[in-house]
């Protein structure tokens, strides 16, 4: 009797089993899209409010998305070697961190399920089918204990 990869590398028999929907085994989601190098410039090109040249984005992403992502969500000091300059780095940082939290927490049925989850999350982010709120992009994979929510509900006294 043959076993699937998920069955042969069981981590948690009660864990989440993940099926591929958007990705193919052995093919990274980043290899499925066409990439281009662009410049992110906000404001007057002669005196920009923000500028990062040579950033890598999927061809399908707009220039507006390029400008916003480069300015707001790429991590690292602008001009430093640590500065992110590709959507691959940004999505990889976030999707990889979230998948690793699941691995460390024993959420997945197998290592293969964790890998599929990471690939599927990467694909949905890459194709802009889903998007996290800003604190996720700012902090996940960068801060040890990141703040991932943008809204806080405070108790309000009801005097009616």
Where are these regions (language model features)?
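Extended catalytic cores of very large enzyme megasubunits
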Residues: 1-160
